[in-house]
């Protein structure tokens, strides 16, 4: 094979790398992380790596120093740069390739699911400072999606890009990363890089290597069962029910918006909705905007048979463009295919459902026609053989964590748990494994981890009851107490009852930054609210004591809320709670002989208000182990 052909093959093999050179010169290949506007971690040895022809000599020039190496027999090479002082921008040269606008500062690895991935463009109305951001000293790199359970990947998929936080680039950021980077920069005045490796709707085990999942049983993949399940999930409406002229007169009717359960739809699969309507003449043939609120989980939307948009998971606002020429005189049609494999299909109330033109609009809420496309119950006999397939794990670690292992970081930020709330009992050991795994991958046993506790979500409960989200928060808290060099941001006041992706990422970032100031930067600062220590019973009262009360216990508002108390019957009722002598005294006239207390123990405990005098909320807790 000729030299040019060899280089072409290497270029195809290592997709996502940048190349420089020509037929007569050497081709140096770099991972997409090594590019313009990159941020390198200060104060530690730095690895710059890539690929070239075997035996090719490589010279890296940076800040007046030269580093030499040679590609090995597999074409791999790397150099180690000594610890660097913060600053920039600088140039880096790798042979003939020039990397511009390089900064040296602090880099944070951001992992998790959709709230870590939440795009900043959704927040511009709430935080008008975002579109006019002008900070070129903080940078953002979004790791391209890559999921592969077969084994680790040496390089990222596609080509990631570093973006600054200037007005022309800030919309490429994720929201939590932006606010956290801003906090760090404003205090320490060093460049900040946010390396975001996240994917919406993912389980924690997807982010853990196979080696660190050895204590969690796995099922073998059953190919026959996979094929049978695929056939059972084939949607009867595909290619037919979205047509404008389809006859839906035999379909049932339903009010939109609303939930499947309240309208009697008992399906774990897809439901097709259709609505016919007439237009104002001003909208015929013109471009329009279709507003379809929010839905659970996945929607595909058609107007007069033309596909106009899809969103793959619950949360994002559904706003779709309807091209000119689609809307016609007479009867028009909107068709919605809504898929919810867990049976919790929902078209969320109090959102906008309209078709808007330049001058007129059509209200779309009201009566629609509907029919079931498929119900995964038909696949259940086969799915039992694939019970653990969805939780097989490691695919995202292999594709989105392992390839960035050489990039030195200051700390990791983990925001995930929504997907695991239904299996909260195993979350603490999984999160412990993830932290140990990433620390081993980076070769840093004391790598700091900043954890986000799940915020409040879903409707408030009238009576105390158990909660998967509360148990998940408990698991996150336990890990933060049991695993060294971790800090927890309590956020049950920063969510939204009807949106799993709350907009207030600034509050979350500020609380994460308090933890960073303490465990990353070594400041003596209060970073935690009161932490339950113990209890004693006196008559019909339970007296609670706390650690980390700082300058003393306090509460937001006039009185403590969201305490529940129970006797031996384990039936919790809302309780009265008061702060006395640095402790909390809990009681209820309904419980004569109390044995247990719970605080902020619900999906949505937003009214819970126990804090210290620094204003930091207590983490939810319980005194029982029921």
Residue ranges, per PLM feature:
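Short, aromatic- and glycine-rich surface loops/edge beta-strands on solvent-exposed regions
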Residues: 87-96, 333-336, 595-601
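Aromatic-lined ligand-binding clefts that engage carbohydrates, nucleic acids, or primary amines
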Residues: 49, 251, 277, 281-305, ...
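C-terminal beta-sandwich/jelly-roll accessory domains of carbohydrate-active enzymes
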Residues: 66, 549-626
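Beta-strand-rich ligand-recognition modules
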Residues: 64-87, 294, 301-354
